[in-house]
């Protein structure tokens, strides 16, 4: 800005200042004209003198005195502010060093390198301050010399007073610095708003760490070393760049310039430029000092933060997590404290701690003076919760002397507290006792504890999920409303389906971290404390336990309802544990008796099958009724046993008679065979006599030529009479006829227990499937589907269950060709291999075999490979993976060509399969067989009637 056209107007400026600030000359006793030796005041005075002499009309001495006094006061106050700021910085640094030394003595873990660095920093700061003081003294001496040179031509008395040497001026400035701080309200320059530390400390909202508003706005410096350079060149450059403090000063001083004498402008420009350069240099020094202070302040803040973090990391090797809310935020108002005996961690607000005594192992060092213990440690017990089966966590005592988890008491509806602030004592009598064991927990790993305690439900609408509070806490399903929300019940829980996934994830992580820390042994925690501290903790713990015992003996009896409320014994987790321990000591296994908790309404006779044990009249009646029923059942069992013995004796007698009848039946069958052969010969003779071929009647037809029915199983029998008693093919005994199972291949009966492996129930037979024994399944038939049944693996691939199949296209040359099969005309039978009979086997007779001797797999003949290549329905190609062969017609079908279409093979291991056509033809054969039986019976009746 060009200030050459502006002239100084001293009289209007002085008058306006005095009027604006209500100046009183009586208070101007501390201002002396002869002490105006500062650079700014002297510079201004010389400038005024040069202007007045150049114009030919020198200004009055009073105006010069006022101008000098104003400039002097401004300079003195600036120096006082500088010195006070430096002293405060030194005092704060000393205090910081003292605090660091104390922390080093307490912790004893600070490295030596940091100490050496800090000492070097302190020495550098002291050197910088000494340099600044020397620089100030030099500038003061230069200003005094310049003011003396400027005031020597003047003849006014003030010029005489300003002629003393440099030592006098320095002593005057030191006296002014030593004087108490006093604000000069008569200054015209809008200087920086500096506030003393005393006034800042008196403010309510003042924070020394955030005191950034009083610092000047300066241009960014590349480094801290830029503020430590000596010389005036750097200061002048900074003054040109800033333009904030110096420009304002120049503008304020430019307002007082006089525009009436243009002739003296050339003579005053040089002196004015010198004065302005000096004033700007002083302002730059002040700005640089403030910049240095601000940078040192920021460095101190970062150092304090870094040290506090290191100290906290050394003190807290882990993050404390509250065992109630699973939060890890520890604040001064709600600190996470730790029991000095068991090591459990909890918020003060979550546990109802009044805050008077804090834990030694807590996160706040200033409060870590008094040991703190949870209620269970104070009483010296290992409690068991009445509301859940879990034993971890922090407990509160009830008014009846029982114990519950504090988290269970908060989340279970109906539980009340005597003192809401301290969350004690807990009252369970207001809760309905029917809730005990009413619902089954869906998260309990042990089903024996699923109905212990009280289960809460999911707070989502219409959700029927029930779980224990601590089981839900393990899964991260517990939630709490915010403090600003006004809700009657701020504690709620959701099941896995309705809970927030992210919220559940971090709670689950915190719970696992809490459990991993709680598993730390007490010996490891004791190692962290000195023997003296551990002894002090144990002594205080014994005092607390003595007080708790005394309070328990003098505590008034809690209120209980007059009528005793029943509660199931199985709903108490502690009772279940004791019963399990008793069973273990008695040698009784609890695993073989599964607990059936299903509440069945009633049995067939209207009586309840099971009722949970409880001290109620209903359970007593059920108990006596059960005993009476047990006696009746035992008597009935004894009677049935006697009847069984009698029937077994009768069965033995009947077996003897049965064997005799079988022998006589065999003789009669042989006689019948002879007579039938004679009849056939006579019938053939009659045919030759008549010259015609006569059809043999059914009565003369040989049994081997008869088509066996479906019920007969396809085997040729010499008698149409069914067997009355069947014998087991393995044990050769005929007992337990209802447990005999017929093999559809070998037509032998087997006991379920005699099979390998034994069966527990009868296999299910369907219309299109049958059952065969293990012997027939291994090597008795040519069915390859059972052997080649594809088993689906977990990864989605399939493999053969018993053997690996060779490729379809590979056919060995040394394999003999299969025998030619000739289809049998007329009607088809139900038996296996009846649609196509090889020429080599068609003349063999099927003799009912006796029990097949079990042979090892190595002695059996290798099975012929069953290759399936063409579908009988669509005539398309295929292989063993997508074709199935019918056991009757031996034709192949695609899985999708069946009716209904299937995705996999209908054959199962141990079962056969026939197509739909064979199944319909077999039903027709049964109908034809029934018709033939009816015709034969009619012929027999006709033959008998003529004889009569």
Curated annotation (Swiss-Prot):
Binding site for Zn(2+) 4: 441, 444, 468, 471
Binding site for Zn(2+) 7: 743, 746, 773, 776
Zinc finger boundaries on the chain: C2HC pre-PHD-type: 382-415
Annotated residues for binding of Zn(2+) 8: 871, 874, 894, 897
Residues the entry annotates as binding Zn(2+) 3: 385, 388, 405, 408
UniProt keyword annotation of Ribonucleoprotein present: no
CDD domains on file: ePHD_PHF14, PHD1_PHF14, PHD2_PHF14, PHD3_PHF14
List of residues binding Zn(2+) 5: 458, 463, 495, 498
Biased composition (Polar residues): 288-297, 936-948
UniProt cross-references to PROSITE patterns, sorted A to Z: EPHD, ZF_PHD_1, ZF_PHD_2
Sequence positions bearing Phosphotyrosine: 206
Stretch list, region Disordered: 22-302, 811-862, 920-948
Residues carrying Phosphoserine: 26, 29, 84, 91, 196, 208, 290, 294, 298, 302, 308, 359, 530, 781-782, 835
BP GO terms, sorted: germinal center B cell differentiation; lung alveolus development; mesenchymal cell proliferation; mesenchymal cell proliferation involved in lung development; negative regulation of cell population proliferation; negative regulation of mesenchymal cell proliferation; negative regulation of mesenchymal cell proliferation involved in lung development; negative regulation of platelet-derived growth factor receptor-alpha signaling pathway
Acidic residues bias: start-end ranges: 60-71, 199-212, 233-256
Residues that bear Phosphothreonine: 287
One GO molecular-function entry: zinc ion binding
Residues bound to Zn(2+) 1: 322, 325, 347, 350
Renumbered zinc finger spans (PHD-type): 319-380, 439-499, 725-779, 868-921
Residues that coordinate or bind Zn(2+) 2: 339, 342, 374, 377
Keyword field: Chromosome, Coiled coil, Cytoplasm, Isopeptide bond, Metal-binding, Nucleus, Phosphoprotein, Repeat, Ubl conjugation, Zinc, Zinc-finger
Residues the entry annotates as binding Zn(2+) 9: 886, 889, 915, 918
Role according to the record: Histone-binding protein. Binds preferentially to unmodified histone H3 but can also bind to a lesser extent to histone H3 trimethylated at 'Lys-9' (H3K9me3) as well as to histone H3 monomethylated at 'Lys-27' (H3K27ac) and trimethylated at 'Lys-27' (H3K27me3). Represses PDGFRA expression, thus playing a role in regulation of mesenchymal cell proliferation. Suppresses the expression of CDKN1A/p21 by reducing the level of trimethylation of histone H3 'Lys-4', leading to enhanced proliferation of germinal center B cells.
Domain notes: The N-terminal region, including the PHD-type 1 and 2 zinc fingers and the C2HC pre-PHD-type zinc finger, is required for binding to histone H3.
Protein name: PHD finger protein 14
Species of origin: Homo sapiens (Human)
Lineage: Eukaryota, Metazoa, Chordata, Craniata, Vertebrata
